[in-house]
Amino acid sequence: MGVELKNNLKQAWWKAMVWQRDDVEGLDASLLTSPNVLKYSGHEDTFTDPLSDCKDCKSRWREDQLTDGICPNCGSKNLTEARPFNLMFKTSIGPVDDGSSYAYLRPETAQQIFTNFKNVLDSTNRAVPFGVAQMGKSFRNEITPGKFIFRVREFEQMELEFFCKPDADEEWFKYWVQSRIDWWLEQGIKKENLEVFEAPQDDLSHYSKATTDLSLIHI
């Protein structure tokens, strides 16, 4: 039943985002990502979580899991200083695993949308504004997976990147936030169960100008 529910949701999303629009193209790109892409996007340096080790029980924790510097496993305060831990899975390319030729499993579906932007532009003769949508697997090497489905190492994303002129970005951002709210309500979620959260400026990703999260707070 779970897989059918997921497939129905994916199909409904694709229908609304691609089939029923004339300004969005669909994409199905590779899971493997060139390190150059993630280097220049900033992910190699900044796609990290702060990590601390407990010197007594040898467990590892994200910094946001620690309260008052106490290990949740054994109660020790003998913790290492937090250090950045990169969340991307690295894999070797070719027959020799000597570290010289490698790629990453994509941490998001966005990167291939950006790297294929020119291909989509040339093959469809489009002009901005237009969007590119993609669904598929993404991978993150979580330090401590858990929290139901919210901290897992393999997961599925449904993503749209919408390209517009710089002076129209705020207008389109507001449009898409409201569009996503309306779509989720159409799927049967009650308005009082949908929380809209605007991230503060100091909590934005390194590539983000603004972020609005929609969260299901009750079922």
Regions found by a protein language model. Name each.
Residues 1-217:
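TRNA-recognition modules of translation machinery and tRNA-sensing kinases, especially anticodon-binding
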